[in-house]
Amino acid sequence: MEHQITLHYRTYENWRKTSVFSEEITERLESLLKTAHAPYSNYPVSSVVVMQSGAMIVGTNQENAAFPSGLCAERVAVLAAKAAHPHEAIQTVYIMTGESEREPAAPCGSCRQVLHETELRQTEPFELILLNKTHNALAFNGVKGLLPFSFTLPR
């Protein structure tokens, strides 16, 4: 039997010319790119997590010479957000890459799993916004579509 998975998302070409994204958040994302520790990949990534209260938690990728020991920006931000606000829902996760010549980068598999489980914990989806520094953006209502067959343990 054949099955089909459909992914719904919005695209924004040259997002700087739209008023869709908060200037405060996009400026913060750009500023944070400078604080990423990416000496091995030279690929800075920043993330801002907006909680339902409006609180903003930030993160950047932090690479390590023992490659699996580094962390991606979105994982840093999401885990810090849930540690600081364990009973508050995440409203939006923004991820910006410093690379301006390509489409926005999608989260890696480990980050998709963490984002998905975070949504399950709070029982409601959050918006995921992927931006590159100068051009395009992708917006998803929830992360389930990015990881349709997530890993879960029996409860």
Question: Where do the PLM segments sit?
Answer:
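Short beta-strand scaffold segments in enzyme catalytic cores
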Residues: 42-51
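Compact, glycine-rich, soluble single-domain proteins
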Residues: 61-73
